[in-house]
């Protein structure tokens, strides 16, 4: 299935899973695996009366579902997971004390996430990071530009939240989890990590 508005090509498999390939121009920007929880038998991409792209799929239960619409999977929570690759912050053999992390996100509603940092490629000799909960207020908007009731008054355009870290390692990766039924979609704009360099690992 081709999704013109997002520059995506979507492939679906007979177990309800799929792969979305996103393009930037003629180049692949990335892939993401999805699990719709329903077997996709037929797909349709069309336009509504406003000219906006709408997507549908038919499943083995006889129902037709609209994709990329609403906040749930037919009333069930949407689960999302993002794993960052390990990054050494430009010094792969130097230990670092990771002190704080700041998330930058945009979304129309409050965002509840869990995240777990992971140090030194999950080395069993390095203490594991603990799982933390994070609540981020929905983003603000611009008067006379954004749609009414889709932004928070007096809110930041990009919402931020920070949390202290207490890990030591040569690098850090991270797992971010989201599971919600009523949250609007959100976008992770950036992550800033504060750390102090330590000795070179020998």
Language-model features, listed with the residues they occupy:
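Beta-sheet repeat architectures centered on beta-propellers
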Residues: 1-202
């Amino acid at each position: 299935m081709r999704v013109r508005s997002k520059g995506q090509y979507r492939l679906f498999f007979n177990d309800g899973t799929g792969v979305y390939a996103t393009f930037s121009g003629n180049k692949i920007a990335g892939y993401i695996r999805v699990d719709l929880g329903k077997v996709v038998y037929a797909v349709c991409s069309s336009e509504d009366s406003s000219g906006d792209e709408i997507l549908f799929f038919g499943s083995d239960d006889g129902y037709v579902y609209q994709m990329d619409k609403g906040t749930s999977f037919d009333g069930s929570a949407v689960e999302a997971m993002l794993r960052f690759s390990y990054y050494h912050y430009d010094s792969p053999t130097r230990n670092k004390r990771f002190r704080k992390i700041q998330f930058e996100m945009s979304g129309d509603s409050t965002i509840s996430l869990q995240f777990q940092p992971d140090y030194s490629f999950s080395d069993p000799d390095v203490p594991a990071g603990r799982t933390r909960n994070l609540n981020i207020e929905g983003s603000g908007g611009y008067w006379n530009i954004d749609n009414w009731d889709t932004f928070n008054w007096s809110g930041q355009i990009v919402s931020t939240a920070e949390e202290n870290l207490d890990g030591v390692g040569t690098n850090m990766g991270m797992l971010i989890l989201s599971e919600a039924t009523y949250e609007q979609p959100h976008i992770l704009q950036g992550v800033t990590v504060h750390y102090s360099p330590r000795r070179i690992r020998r």
